[in-house]
Amino acid sequence: ALALPGGNIIIFEGLLKLADSPEELAGVLAHEAQHIFLKHSTQGILRNFASGVLLALVMGDANAVMDGLVSIAGQINTLGFSRKMELEADRKGMELMLHAKINPQGMLSIFEKLMKEELRLEVSKNSSSTKKNSRKIFSYLSTHPSAQSRLKILDNQIKENSKKFWIP
């Protein structure tokens, strides 16, 4: 799924096939809705633009090489913020699920399925050691936190708050 500026959420067919319950789909929608409510796309666009302008000003001449460096620097600069935004959307999305009295296990369950699917794709793509090394680098540069850490955080949030909001 993907949250767009302006409030639209794109849900891919594969996700609909992967979800076994309305609660799982609600978990994804709660997460994506938080990206919209918190204006994460707008913040990312502005941050990239500001980074590019700042580097161009500092370096003076923004020739083709500098344009490339500015672009790379902007992307690297936003990685930490993007990871932070993903965790924030997870946390706020789970809060939304709990307050709406929707079974919070749905969000945890769909994220577990997505993690398994990600691992399955990773294994099928990484047959050689060169591909494995490039995958490790890509993993480091990923804008999303590790699936394991996200699942652990969500599980803890359910344990801490389910008695207050959700009664299984």
Indicate residue ranges for each PLM-predicted region.
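A Zn2+-metalloprotease active-site environment signal
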Residues: 1-168
